[in-house]
Amino acid sequence: MAVSLPPTLGLSSAPDEIQHPHIKFSEWKFKLFRVRSFEKAPEKAQTEKQDSSEGKPSLEQSPAVLDKPGGQKSALPQPAFKPHPKFLKESHEDGKARDKAIHQANLRRLCRICGNSFNTTGHKRRYPVHGPVDGKTQVLLRKKEKRATSWPDLIAKVFRIDVKADVDSIHPTEFCHNCWSFMHRKFSSTPCEVYSPRNAAMEWHPHTLNCDICHIARRGLKRKSQQPNMQLSKKLKTVIDRARQARQRKRRAQARISSKELMKKIANCGQIHLSPKLLAVDFPAHFVKSISCQICEHILADPVETSCKHVFCRICILRCLKVMGSSCPSCHYPCFPTDLESPVKSFLSILNTLMVKCPAKECNEEISLEKYNHHISSHKESKETFVHINKGGRPRQHLLSLTRRAQKHRLRELKLQVKAFADKEEGGDVKSVCLTLFLLVLRARNEHRQADELEAIMRGQGSGLQPAVCLAIRVNTFLSCSQYHKMYRTVKAITGRQIFQPLHALRNAEKVLLPGYHPFEWQPPLKNVSSSTDVGIIDGLSGLSSSVDDYPVDTIAKRFRYDSALVSALMDMEEDILEGMRAQDLDDYLNGPFTVVVKESCDGMGDVSEKHGSGPVVPEKAVRFSFTVMKITIAHGSQNVKVFEEAKPNSELCCKPLCLMLADESDHETLTAILSPLIAEREAMKSSQLMLEMGGILRTFKFIFRGTGYDEKLVREVEGLEASGSVYICTLCDATRLEASQNLVFHSITRSHAENLERYEVWRSNPYHETVDELRDRVKGVSAKPFIETVPSIDALHCDIGNAAEFYKIFQLEIGEAYKNPHASKEERKRWQATLDKHLRKKMNLKPIMRMNGNFARKLMTKETVEAVCELIPSEERHEALRELMDLYLKMKPVWRSSCPAKECPESLCQYSFNSQRFAELLSTKFKYRYEGKITNYFHKTLAHVPEIIERDGSIGAWASEGNESGNKLFRRFRKMNARQSKYYEMEDVLKHHWLYTSKYLQKFMNAHKAFKNSGFTINLQRSSGDTLDLENSPESQDLMEF
């Protein structure tokens, strides 16, 4: 008797005679003795177990199978028909899915970082790869001030593994306790060695037939192999798999529906969110779905977007993540509250413009979603009263005694009203509305002190310092950015208040003070200079075409563009200029023209080598070019009125750096290559006028440049003259050394930049076909092309240094009585020097130096020093000569040292000619052994040219290079402070910091800060010493202010 199969099995097309009677039993037997490799994934098994518990018996639970013996075999012949190709394909795909599920189950037992199995490690603890860090790690990171808050960031920082792009089917989702311990040891300060669990990152691949992970998992346990049932039909297997898949799809659909209902219950937002049914327009279903929350299916309220690009209401997604775990409710991709972001603005604008119907009765108004809350609150105001009536129960607490959460709950209605008002009237500025309301309440209750403090905070002038004050403190105390940031964090952590401003606020304040911020214009435009005004620090070598044939320039140079730097300097002095105009009874609206006199200085520095920084091999010497705004006048009527004059022209606080280069000043080619563009800008500015808006009015400025801050070595270099040992002794006149020694006093200034250029052309072309000596005598020592125009003058500082060096030599010769023995040996002269050094150290506390400097010269040139030296000289006659020589020198010195000799030392100025002639007479008689037929360069300039320069310029000391020399000390200090890995950036830091140090705007803040700081101390200086406290603005005095 044939047994007919049900049509659902797919065999109804086969005739009854070929169907075996024991097919049903064979199916049960296959289910009972199924091979291990055909087992289902754990998730499917659990689902089937749940279904079976609901009262749906499966084949395994059938009592008929349990009664049969296990060893019974059926003789089922091979079926005479082929299975349908569709069934074979579905069976193959089901096998693939089953293998993938087994692969994922194996992955869950492995560590994502090191690949070890959780079963082999000693600890059973696991940590999610995509989760936030645990409490212990968070405490450790907070101590170390690290910003990482999630495991992906921490794993990327420690192991250099990016887990954000992981896929669950390829990568494990957890890591082991060993890797967790490794990260802890990495960030903890315990003195133990840290070993990485792996030398290289673990590589994970998709599942394949020869998958290593599944192969190792199968090899774990040995089972007795079972003989496959050869009588089982492939067609029956396909039929069973299809039935199983149908059941699984049904269960998944039911689970999906139940999970969606569960999420709606968790969100519980029916009272606060709007249903899509309230939309005024009947939109397509897809559009409604796109603007609806995928959890509660309401219109999106305060929408947020996950990393997998699904959009939810903020309240709904946060509640679901808290209850159901850290995964997206739509796609189950890992998701955390920190990953939520606001959608794009275009989507929000579309959402806010949707029109919805008002759900209130007797209101048929349609309003936009953006104004819905304000509209609904207007309905509530008419019905509700704000006076709370306590109807018994728990007593009502005061607002200030509540927790923050309870305060939010109680003030929720008020907060919504304030927000609606701010959105409507103040552009959404809720903070300003609340602060103003609080301020009005304080004023109404006569609490004006608190009101004044609140008003200061609202204006940004609270208890903290202004960014400009903080910048002034940082610059004047020589703090680098990193040092200031450490101080800022320390003060904020200790006091709990933000007294100092963060670095980004200081950088915004810097931009206003640095060149390249203020717009300006030149009339006519500068020749060969760009018209752009936003030019900051530029490379000093920019514009140089470097080729194989060119001279190799091994240097690093950074500079400002000359015109941009002058504009920044003038804007920095804006208050001083306007105040000067008011002091001269001039109107503020006068637009000029103003005439600005600029002193230029340039000097070389030796031994600036540093042992750090990458970059090219550059000379261990530097050259600095700087300028000082000396005087500003305005044309008023027929005269020029002075509105500004630099009070301390030789201070480093007013000597602004323009160009820094690591080069040797003796390297003529490098010097001309870097300074030539700067000189070209200077020459272009001479014939043009600057149009600059100052005080809201467009004003005109003209510039006069005076190159006086050069020592004699650099003057000879840039004016094309021979070196200092030349026969032509002077840079101001054509006298030779012999002529100057025979005529010590009566000379006049004859040299000029134009004349030097003409003489260079004669030297180059030799038009008269003369010999070298004749040609040299004709051009008076000009041997190179002059490229910088300098003013024929004397540098007061180097004049002091040169004259002190000569007096130091005279002291040695007098100790050895060289007037008796002019041909002494070198050993004797060294002995005289050693005797002098020892005596000066003992009597005057002057330590011997290798090279004369300004401080040593200042201490050496005194009457006390002469008296000490006279103790070593036996002859009384020589005592008198030496004392008279020093006395004459000390009478002449104030004339070239003072900024305005006509006011400061008029008597010395009147007697200068007499004193210089007497000084020259002493040199030619009493000290004839030293000055017969020769004289030093600075003695010649001191005796012959000082009165003429004073008559022409009014001063020598004010135009000296002392400010630039002090700037050299600042350069060394800034270079140590701003040590960087790259020498290029280091030079930029030094130039920028030095420019800020010379800012008058910052100096005013710093002076006010000093005065405020000193006002807290009661120091009676007159009672203690009777002297005034002299705090000079120099790097040495600034050491007192270091933090």
Curated annotation (Swiss-Prot):
GO molecular function terms attached to this record: endonuclease activity; histone binding; metal ion binding; protein homodimerization activity; sequence-specific DNA binding; ubiquitin protein ligase activity; ubiquitin-protein transferase activity; zinc ion binding
Region (Disordered): 39-98
Site (Essential for DNA hairpin formation, participates in base-stacking interactions near the cleavage site): W896
Pfam short name (any one): RAG1_imp_bd
Positions bound to a divalent metal cation: D603, D711, E965
Binding site for Zn(2+) 2: C293, C296, C313, C316
Known catalytic reactions: S-ubiquitinyl-[E2 ubiquitin-conjugating enzyme]-L-cysteine + [acceptor protein]-L-lysine = [E2 ubiquitin-conjugating enzyme]-L-cysteine + N(6)-ubiquitinyl-[acceptor protein]-L-lysine
Matches recorded under PROSITE patterns: NBD (PS51487), ZF_RAG1 (PS51765), ZF_RING_1 (PS00518), ZF_RING_2 (PS50089)
InterPro entries per the UniProt record, alphabetical: RAG1, RAG1_imp-bd, RAG1_Znf, RAG_nonamer-bd_dom, Znf_C2H2_sf, Znf_RING, Znf_RING/FYVE/PHD, Znf_RING_CS
The keyword Lipoprotein is annotated on this UniProt entry: no
Changes after translation: Autoubiquitinated in the presence of CDC34/UBCH3.
Gene Ontology biological-process annotations: adaptive immune response; B cell differentiation; chromatin organization; pre-B cell allelic exclusion; protein autoubiquitination; T cell differentiation in thymus; V(D)J recombination
SMART domains cross-referenced by the UniProt entry: RING (SM00184)
Claim: DNA-binding is one of the keywords in the record: yes
Residues annotated as binding Zn(2+) 4: C358, C363, H375, H379
Subcellular location: Nucleus
CDD domains attached to this UniProt entry: RING-HC_RAG1
Residues where Zn(2+) 3 binds: C308, H310, C328, C331
Subunit structure: Homodimer. Component of the RAG complex composed of core components RAG1 and RAG2, and associated component HMGB1 or HMGB2. Interacts with DCAF1, leading to recruitment of the CUL4A-RBX1-DDB1-DCAF1/VPRBP complex to ubiquitinate proteins and limit error-prone repair during V(D)J recombination.
Family under the similarity heading: Belongs to the RAG1 family.
Protein name: V(D)J recombination-activating protein 1
Organism listed in the record: Sus scrofa
